[in-house]
């Protein structure tokens, strides 16, 4: 549905795609200025920690238990009421379908009760715009979306307009961080714990595989690194050895991300004017210091500006969902109340159709 809105917009965002129950109220001014009025996140770390990862059934039940209170707290903290909302933006996928259904159903209920439009947001589109929560970033830009479930390079030319340049052919970078951290006996979530352990380690001590060296595309692969590091971890007996392996893994992931970004920048430069050379990194792995340093070096080398979300908005949050919804609503784009939850939902669906070998799994289109 379309019905352009040029005035200020007050949007409630809801995020329940994995193990964070989050709600946020964001104001988007008519000139595009964004203000986060509240951001409330309910974590489920303690529920999933004994299992070393997210258990979908536990996550969905936890969302059901907490979504009411968290949304109410976000509205209260913003100093507004539900009746003041101009729209509701809820993650509709991709993600764990049980959790996605909880947030989307709650969003539909609020929208229906208040007579407000609903925007069913692609979780990845939320990450794509998340850097705009901390800075005014114009379109177009080159985006590295890197998290526990996703690893993609995208050319973003406008709201919802994404062209995929590269994607992982197996595991995501964040998954590699988490699984290797688990093999090292580190607590969940593993990525931040591995980064902490890596401080002072020797990244050259262990020989770790480098993926897809013979290819000149922008795709990623982390399964070989994950397997090799897990095997080495089984043999380690000292803290120094564990520290060195953590440093090596972090360096290997940062190097591969940097190499593919460098390739993508060269492709992007061929079709864009110098004033449009903007690079954005988003997703949970964007909080890793070694990764940021490697990507900053790519930007300096290729003449790109660098932007990343504030650290609070790197991992899953509802402010980015509210912003993505506000951007769509400002263009008059919103959804019917029969919008469905989509566990698989590519940002660039054309690329998914053009390359089904990389884009489809047993459960449908990959993210």
Curated annotation (Swiss-Prot):
Pfam families linked: TsaD
Cofactor(s) listed: Fe(2+)
Keywords: Acyltransferase, Cytoplasm, Iron, Metal-binding, Transferase, tRNA processing
Catalytic reaction equation(s): L-threonylcarbamoyladenylate + adenosine(37) in tRNA = N(6)-L-threonylcarbamoyladenosine(37) in tRNA + AMP + H(+)
One GO term of the biological process aspect: tRNA threonylcarbamoyladenosine modification
EC number: 2.3.1.234
Primary enzyme class: transferase
Residues where substrate binds: 145-149, 178, 191, 288
Cited function: Required for the formation of a threonylcarbamoyl group on adenosine at position 37 (t(6)A37) in tRNAs that read codons beginning with adenine. Is involved in the transfer of the threonylcarbamoyl moiety of threonylcarbamoyl-AMP (TC-AMP) to the N6 group of A37, together with TsaE and TsaB. TsaD likely plays a direct catalytic role in this reaction.
NCBIfam families from the UniProt entry: gcp_kae1 (TIGR00329), T6A_TsaD_YgjD (TIGR03723)
Protein name, as recorded: tRNA N6-adenosine threonylcarbamoyltransferase
Species name: Caulobacter vibrioides (strain ATCC 19089 / CIP 103742 / CB 15) (Caulobacter crescentus)
């Amino acid at each position: 549905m379309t019905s352009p809105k040029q005035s200020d917009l007050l949007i409630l965002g809801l995020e329940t795609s994995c193990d964070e129950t989050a709600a946020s109220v964001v104001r988007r001014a008519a000139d595009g200025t964004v203000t986060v009025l509240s951001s409330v996140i309910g974590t489920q770390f303690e529920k999933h920690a004994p299992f070393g990862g997210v258990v979908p059934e536990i996550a969905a039940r936890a969302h059901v238990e907490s979504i009411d209170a968290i949304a109410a707290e976000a509205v209260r903290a913003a100093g507004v009421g539900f009746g003041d909302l101009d729209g509701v933006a809820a993650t509709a996928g991709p993600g764990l379908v049980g959790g996605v259904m909880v947030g989307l159903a709650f969003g539909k209920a609020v929208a229906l009760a208040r007579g407000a439009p609903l925007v069913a947001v692609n979780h990845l589109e939320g990450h794509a715009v998340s850097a705009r929560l901390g800075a005014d970033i114009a379109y177009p830009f080159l985006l590295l979306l890197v998290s526990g479930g996703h690893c993609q390079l995208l050319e973003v030319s406008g709201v919802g307009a994404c062209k995929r340049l590269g994607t992982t052919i197996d595991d995501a970078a964040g998954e590699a961080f988490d699984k290797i951290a688990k093999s090292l006996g580190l607590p969940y979530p593993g990525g931040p714990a591995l980064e902490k352990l890596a401080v002072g380690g020797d990244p050259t001590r262990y020989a770790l595989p480098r993926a897809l060296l013979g290819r000149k595309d922008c795709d990623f692969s982390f399964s070989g690194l994950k397997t090799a590091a897990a095997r080495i971890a089984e043999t380690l007996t000292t803290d120094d050895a564990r520290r060195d392996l953590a440093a090596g893994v972090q360096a290997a992931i940062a190097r591969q991300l940097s190499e593919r970004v460098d390739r993508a920048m060269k492709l992007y430069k061929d079709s864009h004017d110098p004033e449009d050379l903007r690079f954005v990194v988003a997703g949970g792995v964007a909080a890793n210091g070694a990764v940021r340093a490697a990507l900053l070096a790519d930007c300096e080398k290729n003449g790109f500006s660098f932007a990343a979300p504030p650290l609070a908005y790197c991992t899953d949050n509802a402010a980015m969902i509210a912003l993505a919804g506000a951007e769509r609503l400002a263009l008059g784009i919103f959804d019917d109340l029969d919008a469905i939850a989509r566990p698989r939902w590519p940002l660039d669906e054309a690329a998914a159709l053009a390359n089904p070998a990389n884009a489809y799994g047993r459960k449908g289109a990959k993210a």
